[in-house]
Amino acid sequence: MSGDYILNEDGTLRKPHVTPSVPTMNELAFQFNETGAEQAARHFIDLINYSWASGDTTALDEFSEERCTYCQVISQRIHDVYDNGGWAYGLKYTVSQVEGNYPVKTDTPETAQFTDCYVMSFLMHRSKADRYEPPTLEHVPAGTGRLIPIVHWDGSEWKMAEAGGEDIETAQSE
């Protein structure tokens, strides 16, 4: 054994047994307003947590619009770890505080593409976790950061249009 982890026959570390379930969206998310937007953004965070725990990004990718580069980066980072025999254990993001939640003003060329969108600011907490990328086991410390999600209402449901933040992006690779 290596620490609390069991070695496989090939010398790699076996991932601890976890059986996460694909998160379902809160009923309050099925409305085009501030509450629905916040619940959709929280669902996105739940999907990130599920994807890191399972290695399965299907639900995350389906919830993300093609234009969401942040979503693509997270999905690819998870694939980079899991597709090469690695895993993450204990990694969880939680919203500590909602600092803002507003409809996007689309009166500038930079924001015109965000019709029917809400932008939020979340103060986030990241749990301490272990990430294994053969042959390295890394103990990722707990941390905080800010996530700025933009969710889009397509007329019947929310999708993640874009996101960004400070420290939260680098949390994926610390």
Regions found by a protein language model. Give the residues of each.
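Short, mixed-charge, low-aromatic patches
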Residues: 1-4, 15-17, 31-34, 102-108
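Amphipathic, hydrophobic N-terminal targeting peptides for secretion and organelle import
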Residues: 1-22, 165-168
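Compositionally biased, low-complexity repeat tracts
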Residues: 7, 96, 139-141
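Core segments of small alpha/beta cavity-forming domains
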Residues: 12-89
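A mature extracytoplasmic/lumenal domain signature
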Residues: 64-67, 75, 93, 122-126, ...
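A short, amphipathic edge element
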Residues: 84-107
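Exposed beta-sheet edge and beta->alpha loop/turn motif
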Residues: 102-174
